[in-house]
Structure formats: structure tokens, C-alpha cells
Amino acid sequence: MDFSQLGGLSGLLDGVKKEFSQLEEKNKDTIHTSKSGGGMVSVSFNGLGELVDLQIDDSLLEDKEAMQIYLMSALNDGYKAVEENRKNLAFNMLGNFAKL
């Protein structure tokens, strides 16, 4: 086994860690907004999957069932958008890793 290449591997891993940290920081600032009920409910998630904003039209305060349905729909759509973005970032990072 040629141990002389381990130094290069360490540098490669450091590069991957740095790129991952940069992507994670960029992802944190990305906002994904989903709406349901014709815009009566709007939710926004950051790239880390944290809910950062929630808007509910006042007219829904009288209709609990509709509000629940619209909230679930908007939250599920927002969560899917965050997950899709995470997958894309991971594939991009793997693509960049393959180039090294």
C-alpha cells in the first residue's frame, strides 16, 4: 500500500468539508415559499428546513377545517421543496467531488 498518497487524501477531504460548509451556509439563506387555498395560507422555509414565516388569511379563522387542510398542504409542499433542494445540492457536491 502506498501511504504517500494519504496526504493528498487529507487535502481532498479538507476541500470537501470546506465546500460542504459553504453550500450549507448558502442553503441557510435560501427561502422556499409554498401557498395553498389560492394564497390563503403561505409558509416559508429556509434551506435547513426551518419554518421562517407563516401567513394565514383572516377569513380562515372562522373555518378550522379548511385552515387545517390548507396548512397541511402548504407545509407538505414546502417540506418537499426543501428536500428537493437538499438532493440537488448533494448531487452537485458529488459532481464537484468527482472532478477533483
UniProtKB/Swiss-Prot annotation:
InterPro entries assigned = YbaB-like_sf, YbaB/EbfC
Q: Identify the keywords attached in UniProt to this record, alphabetized.
A: Cytoplasm, DNA-binding
Assembly, in brief, is:
Homodimer.
Source domain of life: Bacteria
Which Gene Ontology cellular component terms are annotated? bacterial nucleoid; cytoplasm
Q: Explain the purpose of this protein.
A: Binds to DNA and alters its conformation. May be involved in regulation of gene expression, nucleoid organization and DNA protection.
Molecular function via GO: DNA binding
Name of the protein described by the UniProt record: Nucleoid-associated protein jhp_0031
Protein location: Cytoplasm, Nucleoid
The species this protein belongs to is Helicobacter pylori (strain J99 / ATCC 700824)
Q: Which family does the record claim for this protein?
A: Belongs to the YbaB/EbfC family.
Q: Which NCBIfam families match?
A: DNA_YbaB_EbfC
